[in-house]
Amino acid sequence: VKNPLATSRLDLEIAKMARSCTPIPDRTFVMGMIELAEFVGLINRHEANDYRDRLDLKFCERNDHLKRVSA
């Protein structure tokens, strides 16, 4: 059962990771949002895992970018 508001907000927060100046705490915050949405039944486990994978990908991309530009 997909909740359009919850999924839209998760999509937005994951997209914002691309501009994050502090990707580690931002990743933790969004991961908490995903966990809560799954716990209260706004998204199912498959959707939550998909969001986690997308978040990890964006986090790694942003973290690598920040490491490159600061070197």
PLM features per residue range, with description:
Residues V1-M31:
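N-terminal acidic leader/helix
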Residues T28-L66:
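Short, charge-rich amphipathic interface segments used for partner binding and complex assembly
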